[in-house]
Amino acid sequence: MKLKYNILAIVAAIALGSCSSSKKVGEAVDLNGEWNIVEVGGTAIDTTKTEFSPTLGFETAKNSVFGCAGCNSINGIARVNAAKQTISFKEIGTTLMLCAHMEYEQQILQALESVKAYKSAGEGRVQLTNGSGKAMLTLQTQ
């Protein structure tokens, strides 16, 4: 009988131990700060084909977004509703440099136009999604 209780206690400890507090997919995300753009449209970005590493940064209290699309700097307005995990971008502007590799730049800027929401993708990642829930951009903490 004592053996049964010991086994039950071990099983319970293992079960409770698996309920860790690490971030899981779908949890609330604080967008504030700078992020690396690691995927666009579900495809990994090859940074050898960009002049600079693509990034996005957010200051949600100021409704501000900034970063780099791979060549040009990005600035604009980002309206974030953290409770609903929705986001909209307005007045996105870029510098006007011409770089050898511009393919990701165009894809990133087009993706920003269709972003409506965001969600945790686990492991320090966040996905910016369109109205259908498709990941348009995947961001990784810096």
Regions found by a protein language model. Name each.
Residues M1-D30:
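Bacterial Sec-dependent N-terminal signal peptides
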Residues C19-Q142:
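Lipid interaction determinants
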